[in-house]
Amino acid sequence: DEVGYSEADDPYYYGLSLIRRIAQAPGQEIGSHSFSHYYCLEPGQTLAQFEADIDAALAVAKQSSIELRSFVFPRNQYAPEHLAVLRRRGFTAFRGNERSWVYRPSDGAGQSKLRRAVRLADHYANLTGHHIYDIYAAGTREGLTEVTSSRFLRPYSAHLAPLEPMRITRIKSSMDVAAANGGIYHLWWHPHNFGLDIDENVAVLRQVLDHFARHRERAGMTSRNIGDFA
């Protein structure tokens, strides 16, 4: 399909009104995911290319008076030199990967079948830990605050539907540990992950949010964005 010329005739490719709504919503932050969904660790990529990509992202944000301070790396690919680029351009925080060998940053070729299989199983059984963090004890990396991932909220799968209770329990149990110890539990997903099986995905999200609400009432758990920790 050809890309349209404005949000009015092509809302799937343009979303300035959505950006403005997010910017006005209390507690929400607009961060960066790079300009071109840049894969830092794939063969042939250079630091100069990454710098140009970040400069483009900053320029676009500036047009809407948005100050970018938090960053999420596409495919969770990054190295220390990429963090240094972000720091020099004013970023203060980024989402880091879970501290397990199966989540270690790598290019596509490094994502072996074994790593993928363990990551999938880890969504249903606690194979790598709860990934609860004390962000202030962890310090910084290359001058940036690392807000480490705890869990990707993977989308509903009809093939794995019998395991859904295990997936939800995996998330809730980690939230329980965070609430009991005053730690950080960082749950994330992409909006398009809910594009299929919307009812099933929203139902899971409601269960997670209801569980959070109980911890908010009983233990004072709060919902924060990445920039809040920088």
Give residue ranges: language-model regions.
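Catalytic alpha-helical scaffold of carbohydrate-active enzymes acting on polysaccharides/glycoconjugates
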Residues: D1-S70, R75-V147, L163-L187, F194-A230
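C-terminal active-site rim and adjoining tail of enzyme catalytic domains
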Residues: V147-L160
